[in-house]
UniProtKB/Swiss-Prot annotation:
Catalytic function, reaction form: 5alpha-cholest-8,14-dien-3beta-ol + NADPH + H(+) = 5alpha-cholest-8-en-3beta-ol + NADP(+); 4,4-dimethyl-5alpha-cholesta-8,24-dien-3beta-ol + NADP(+) = 4,4-dimethyl-5alpha-cholesta-8,14,24-trien-3beta-ol + NADPH + H(+); 4,4-dimethyl-8,14-cholestadien-3beta-ol + NADPH + H(+) = 4,4-dimethyl-5alpha-cholest-8-en-3beta-ol + NADP(+)
Role: Catalyzes the reduction of the C14-unsaturated bond of lanosterol, as part of the metabolic pathway leading to cholesterol biosynthesis. Anchors the lamina and the heterochromatin to the inner nuclear membrane.
Xref: SMART domains: TUDOR
InterPro entries: ERG24_DHCR-like, Lamin-B_rcpt_of_tudor, Sterol_reductase_CS, Tudor
Top EC class for this record: oxidoreductase
Protein name listed in UniProt: Delta(14)-sterol reductase LBR
EC number: 1.3.1.70
Subunit structure: Interacts with DNA. Interaction with DNA is sequence independent with higher affinity for supercoiled and relaxed circular DNA than linear DNA.
Amino acid sequence: MPNRKYADGEVVMGRWPGSVLYYEVQVTSYDDASHLYTVKYKDGTELALKESDIRLQSSFKQRKSQSSSSSPSRRSRSRSRSRSPGRPAKGRRRSSSHSREHKEDKKKIIQETSLAPPKPSENNTRRYNGEPDSTERNDTSSKLLEQQKLKPDVEMERVLDQYSLRSRREEKKKEEIYAEKKIFEAIKTPEKPSSKTKELEFGGRFGTFMLMFFLPATVLYLVLMCKQDDPSLMNFPPLPALESLWETKVFGVFLLWFFFQALFYLLPIGKVVEGLPLSNPRKLQYRINGFYAFLLTAAAIGTLLYFQFELHYLYDHFVQFAVSAAAFSMALSIYLYIRSLKAPEEDLAPGGNSGYLVYDFFTGHELNPRIGSFDLKYFCELRPGLIGWVVINLAMLLAEMKIHNQSMPSLSMILVNSFQLLYVVDALWNEEAVLTTMDITHDGFGFMLAFGDLVWVPFVYSLQAFYLVGHPIAISWPVAAAITILNCIGYYIFRSANSQKNNFRRNPADPKLSYLKVIPTATGKGLLVTGWWGFVRHPNYLGDIIMALAWSLPCGFNHILPYFYVIYFICLLVHREARDEHHCKKKYGLAWERYCQRVPYTHISLHLLEHSTYLICKLKYTSHLCTWSVCYLGFKH
């Protein structure tokens, strides 16, 4: 790890974020993890700056002396040059003493420059946790539309600017300030991504190696348990014969399904959008047609049912389909790793470039592997597994009717199918939102995502419907109504929080988002502190957990197996929350610490527990320790 260049207490010149202006600052601390210096301006403002944004004072003095001095020969030659009497003067030449006074006067103006909140931003100066909160109201977006059109990243910085640089003599025009920003952005060289992954997740090399065996075994265990008459946790199912786990016809049907969805992905329907900037910094294009693929799939399934195709074939060969999907995901992962060895450095994933074969194979070595315009990771994220989840649920519904000789499916099966159908349709309708997630922007495409998308999602998430086929549960209409209300509450929290976040990430200058308050960061982005995101840090996770509980409640309380999804999902979100916290702290530095002080609760349960008794608070930390003990199940889908 490189040594720090500037010591604590050293007085240097620091660049103000988003501008080309440097001010005298004092170094207060240095973060070894994020490589950011915390500096303090003369007015008391503290910011986290990169080392490239800090200069020694001597370099400024030397630059000034070089620019103001000239050689004696040049001075004598300029003074000896005469002007003809009949030639009109273009302008009155200032004396050296006058220019010297002007420079000193200009120097005073620069020294008197103050950092003051701009009037239009309506900054909130209320205090939180003993510190003044200087969050900015996003009111300048309407004015941006009237100004000359700027680049989207410059517009975002203009919305998020918390302070204006105003001299006591006169204020500089906004157009000049942002013209300087545009020049600075034009000459600025993009930062090169880090060559190697230093911080290993999921237990490092040993943990990822074990997970590659543990995850397929977990899927097989859950599927075999559901087929038993008594699916108790201690009632282990007998191991099936190896030849019974594989059927070539089933594998052929799975391949047909995969390439069937790939064909829908390639259809020239739906809009084409750009993803977030990569480290290059280029932007990839994506075709948004997942919802159209879902409609075409529904039409194809309806046609098969019309011609008396037995869809419950999925139920009869559910174990073989899970094994086929696992084998295909392993083959796909091997292909992805082999092709990633020839990928250029800038195309590698920041979290999957450790140099260790097993770890990079599991987490994904290449960030966005593509065959032409076909993005493999983006395709697998929402298409084969997510749409396949709905098809499996429908097959379980038809299997229940056939096995139990029912003319209508049970109310429990209807609730499970309806709730999960809503979740899938919502994901496909808001397909563009997945482009801002860590799956696309940070994680590579390896075994973790391939197995999660193609095996874990369709065969574990459909566990409730599969359970109800062999273990029917009768529930009353009032109970069904209560469960429906619970699912609607979870969905409302989940959708409203995600929509607010995704819309702000896409276009922070949107006039519809002018009510939002943000904490500006040194990266030019802002941290939301309004609405759900000002109440808890991960409100979308709360909605997910509530919906997961609503999906399991129709299965009753005879066995804990249908509630595996809820338990797993809490572990997943706790682990993902820890990853988010670490990533954001490293990226935003001091601004993230201010955000954590402003929004101290990670999810709503902690917010409510603060007002509870001391005993409940103790249980809160105990539950956190318990969830961490099984967090290795929490890989991302």
